[in-house]
Regions:
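N-terminal glycine-rich phosphate-binding loop and ensuing alpha1 helix
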Residues: 9-14, 20-22, 26-27, 56-123
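Active-site activation/catalytic loop segments of kinase-like enzymes and analogous catalytic loops
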Residues: 498-528
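ATP-binding pocket architecture of kinase catalytic cores
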Residues: 313-420, 434-441
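Conserved beta-loop-beta/alpha segment of the NTase-like Rossmann-fold superfamily
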Residues: 126-196
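Helix-rich C-terminal or lid/interface subdomains of diverse kinases
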Residues: 256-257, 276, 522-540
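Conserved alpha/beta core of the MobA/IspD/sugar-nucleotide pyrophosphorylase nucleotidyltransferase superfamily
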Residues: 13-16, 51-69, 216-301
């Protein structure tokens, strides 16, 4: 049976035949398709001459009936900033109802009780679903490093006659049915550049060139046994290859230039994927999740209203923080929300003290707000900024000149960045677990052997950036002039300023010749041997 024949047989299994015109309306196909399909179904033994389903049709019907569902809810929902700092995406509320609860209720409406929810990020917040709805939670421990292809691998033995559903969608009408006769993947009639597929005349999902535009991929799918087996085997193969760690599960549906399942097309207004704060605001401006601490803080700091906060975009860069770009009153800002566990690594009170010390000195990005308790920070976005290119010696000379000028200010704060003390502190975070590196103890001993020389030649300690790497030097245009701003002062403290020179070299992956060239750029009047050796020690 092809898709049209399956649709028509499905309609006849639900309601008795009256005439072809009504059947065309119910099935969504033309009179010509209905007439042709009825002949084929009779010929294949699925219908008798009275156009009633045969025992063969009923058997097919039962064999392909939906039995279970898998809801994918493990991911961060990175684009949902700032909501994802407080709530996993599946629990976002629309009209007072969590997305995942609506999905579960819609599944229950069509008789599906066997439901697996794959969780990871904030998994404990989903635990109530087990008691309230009888679902089974499956934990994906790799949610932070791998995409949902790996989530589906954990439940691949349950793919037969199963719906696969993302947790971040809101369906106006129930997208599930008591009966299905073929596998499908849901797309909408909306054209998006992000989509990889489009629907052709045969209702196949064929791939499109990047940014060529295709049907928006909703993410809901249904798999009958034959296709479930194929997808399960494909998932197993793909998950063995590291290049697919970041892949979506749909990767397992492709064979050459198309998906192995047919398209199910819905109107774009019937199914809404909620990926961003603003998409949630569009569908439900009164949603409880819109009232986040971050938005309230922005409004207070910038004397704004929630509706003034627009164009929210996640910024993935940063080792320890979750940051996002936003616009407020026609001005762009970046908000930093410290990541989990960063309070162990960074003293936010000390960081705030550093920003107080460098305020109004035109050294860093402009701070609109900083909280010394939780580390929340709002800075003005530097439009058109670029980072230093460590392979461009002109860039390097300008950055070293800027660094030298900062050091010449000899600013003071009340705390010190103790390099060797920090090494010992980081070891305490291991909780007694030995290093995975076999030569760690030997390397550590070599490093500590340098301490006497460093202590003897450190000189005066002043406010030092500590993280003066190329990416933290920003070139910006201000009033027609080029300026260099030094950003990210989380680790700054009192220390030998020459540590900053060493850090630039380390993160630039310089060899000795390049290190000496950088030292020459900083010490324009020459560098004595003792200082040069000390910088080598810091690099080591």
């Amino acid at each position: 049976m092809n898709k049209q024949e399956s649709d028509i047989l499905n309609a006849l299994l639900l309601e008795p035949f009256i005439n072809q015109r009504i059947l065309a309306e119910v099935s969504g196909h033309s009179l010509g398709v209905v007439n042709r399909s009825l002949k084929e179904l009779i010929k294949a033994g699925y219908l008798n001459e009275a156009i009633s389903p045969t025992a063969k049709a009923v058997s097919e019907y039962k064999n392909k009936t939906p039995k279970r569902a898998i809801i994918l809810a493990a991911g961060f929902g990175m684009r949902m900033v700032p909501i994802n700092t407080e709530m996993p995406k599946g629990l976002l509320e629309v009209n007072g109802e969590p997305l995942i609860e609506r999905i579960i209720k819609q599944l229950h409406e069509v008789g599906i009780q066997e439901i697996y929810v794959v969780v990871g990020f904030m998994k404990e917040k989903y635990e109530y679903l087990m008691d309230e709805y009888g679902v089974e939670l499956v934990i994906n421990p790799d949610y932070a490093s791998k995409n949902n292809l790996h989530s589906l691998k954990l439940v691949k033995e349950h793919l037969e006659n199963a719906y696969i559903v993302p947790c971040d969608i809101w369906c106006d009408r129930n997208p599930f049915h008591r009966h299905e006769l073929y596998s499908w993947y849901m797309v909408s009639d909306l054209v998006e550049n992000e989509s990889n597929v489009r629907v052709n005349r045969k209702m196949e999902l064929v791939t499109v060139p990047e940014n060529a535009g295709g049907n928006a991929m909703v993410g809901i799918s249904y798999l009958i046994k034959e296709d479930a087996d194929t997808v399960s085997n494909r998932i197993e193969e793909l998950c063995k290859k590291p290049q697919y760690d970041g892949s979506f599960w749909e990767e397992a549906l492709y064979k050459k230039d198309r998906m192995i399942v047919t398209a199910r097309v819905v109107h774009s207004a019937d199914v809404v994927e909620i990926n961003t704060y603003e998409q949630l605001r569009e569908i439900d401006s009164d949603s409880n999740q819109l009232k986040t601490d971050a938005i309230r803080l922005i409004c207070k700091a910038l004397c704004a209203k929630p509706e003034d906060v627009t164009d929210i975009t996640v910024l993935k860069k940063g080792m320890t923080n979750r940051s996002f770009l936003f616009t407020c009153k026609d001005k762009k800002y970046i908000m930093r929300i410290p990541g989990e566990g960063t309070d162990q690594l960074i003293n936010r009170r000390q960081e705030a003290a550093v920003y107080h010390a460098i305020a109004d000195k035109n050294i860093c990005d402009d701070i609109a707000y900083i909280n010394p308790e939780n580390g929340y920070k709002i800075t003005e976005f530097l439009e058109g900024a670029r980072v230093c290119d460590p392979t461009d010696y002109e860039d390097v000379k300008k950055c070293m000149s800027r660094l030298r000028d900062f050091h010449a200010m000899k600013l003071k704060v009340a705390h010190e960045f103790d390099i060797f003390g920090q090494m010992e502190f980081y070891e305490t975070l291991w909780d007694g677990t030995p290093s995975v590196y076999k030569d760690y103890e030997k390397t550590k001993a070599n490093v500590w052997s340098l301490k006497p020389y460093i202590d003897a030649h450190a000189g005066e300690k002043i406010l030092t950036h500590i993280d003066a790497v190329p990416d933290n030097f920003l070139f910006v245009q201000k009033n027609g002039k080029e300026e260099i701003r030094l950003i990210d002062w989380e680790y700054a403290g009192m220390q030998d300023p020459h540590v900053d020179i060493a850090m630039f070299c380390i993160y630039s992956l310089y060899n000795k010749r390049q290190v000496d060239r950088l030292i020459a750029a900083y010490f324009t009047d020459g560098c004595d041997d003792a200082t040069r050796i000390k910088i080598y020690c810091y690099i080591a």
